[in-house]
Design a protein with these regions (language model features):
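A structural motif shared across PLP-dependent enzymes of the aminotransferase-like
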Residues: 102-115
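Mid-domain Rossmann-like dinucleotide-binding core that forms the NAD(H)/NADP(H) cofactor-binding site
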Residues: 126-201
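A generic alpha-to-beta junction signature in SAM-dependent methyltransferases
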Residues: 147-148, 215, 228-229
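Glycine-rich beta-strand-centered segment in the early N-terminal region that forms part
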Residues: 29-44, 53-105
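A short acidic, Gly/Pro-enriched loop at the edge of an enzyme's catalytic core
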Residues: 204-211
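Glycine-rich phosphate-binding loop and adjacent beta-alpha segment
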Residues: 222-287, 328-335
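C-terminal hydrophobic helical "lid"/dimerization subdomain
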Residues: 4-8, 276-335
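Helix N-cap at the beta1-alpha1 junction of Rossmann-like dinucleotide-binding domains, i.e.
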Residues: 184-187, 218, 241
Length: 335
């Protein structure tokens, strides 16, 4: 396809104010040397982080650190934000043409980026499932932070998208015990689909070597302190944005020598930082998606035109989703 045939405009989703989003037209440049034009097939709404952006709740002190790789605008808005996009290279270097790719790009129907920003989706990974690459990457980074060992007892608190991903990867480890813990009994259905034991917080087993906390709640983090064993470690994978969290650190926290360590996907985990790049981590993540068990996280679909309404429904709690997929028009339907 020649540059003359390419549309002069693209359409992207922007957060334009607190709890307000819209689709906006913008110019689409021709790709330069080392760049590719990507036509989007699917994108995914990363509910936790994207709703923080939707609510204009990104703390000013971390606004720069929380920028997405291809974000435009700045927090609180207007801002073009998102990072789960899968598409097809329509124009670019010869060895990239026609390739299905993942990109940490906002919700947009076509975009031009350096090919260094793209990750090839391997054979055996459907494009729709490949949307999960960025979230699997977060889980991979958390496991690299924690370094689970043979025979460990592990709990994952919070059976949402990130917690479920962590449990999915851990289920292949030779652990003595793994529990996925959540207040919502309906999450047992997800645990069953993943082949992981499920527990209500009151019934979760204590004396864990590692607890991954992914519930983004004060109660979940407090429960983590109760479940982790002496001198054990809590890997905090939640982002609380502008919310304050209180913890009972005056009880036995010091006597038991417990540790709470943050894991954030913006940088490769310290244990692998000198030997793995962000690109290596993404390639690891997308290869893991050959396992069809990950389809359990794809819980709904809206069209690109419906994206603003879908975000509002997720915000209002009227749309229950782990990863809500946005489906883009095919080339044929846009002619």
């Amino acid at each position: 396809m020649t540059s003359a045939q390419q549309p002069a405009e693209a359409t992207a989703y922007w957060t334009v104010g607190p709890d307000q989003g819209e689709l906006r037209a913008e110019g689409l440049p021709a790709p330069g040397p080392g760049e590719a034009l990507v036509r989007t097939l699917y994108s995914g709404i990363s509910k936790g982080t994207e709703l923080v952006v939707h609510h204009a709740s990104v703390p000013p002190c971390v606004a720069e650190q929380m920028r997405a790789p291809h974000q435009e605008g700045s927090f609180p808005g207007p801002v073009k934000f998102g990072y789960l996009s899968v598409g097809v290279v329509e124009e670019g270097p010869e060895d990239w043409a026609g390739q299905t790719v993942f990109c940490l790009h906002p919700h947009q129907d076509r975009y031009v980026v350096p090919v260094t920003s793209l990750t090839r989706v391997p054979d055996g990974v459907p494009p729709r499932r490949a949307v999960l690459t960025g979230t699997v990457e977060t889980a991979v980074n958390g496991l690299w932070e924690a370094g689970p060992r043979l025979g460990d007892r592990i709990a994952v608190i919070g059976a949402g998208l990130v917690g479920g991903m962590v449990a999915t990867l851990l289920r292949t480890f030779p652990l003595a015990r793994l529990q996925l813990v959540d207040l919502d009994p309906a999450r047992k259905k997800l645990a069953d689909a993943l082949g992981v034991d499920f527990a209500h917080p009151d019934d979760a087993l204590p004396d864990c070597d590692i607890v991954f906390h992914c519930s983004a709640s004060e109660g979940g983090l407090e429960r983590s302190l109760k479940l982790v064993g002496d001198e054990g470690e809590i890997i905090e994978m939640s982002w609380y944005a502008d919310r304050r969290v209180s913890l009972p650190l005056g009880e036995d926290f010091h006597a038991r020598r417990l540790s709470i360590r943050a894991s954030q996907v913006g940088a490769v985990a310290r244990a692998r930082r000198h030997r793995r790049t962000n690109a290596d981590r993404l390639e690891t993540a997308v290869a893991l998606l050959k396992d069809p068990v990950f389809d359990a996280f794809l819980t709904g679909t809206s069209t690109f035109k419906e994206l603003p309404d879908a975000v509002q429904q997720l915000s209002a709690g009227t749309l229950d989703a782990l990863c809500h997929i946005i489906e883009y028009p095919t080339t044929e339907s846009t002619r």
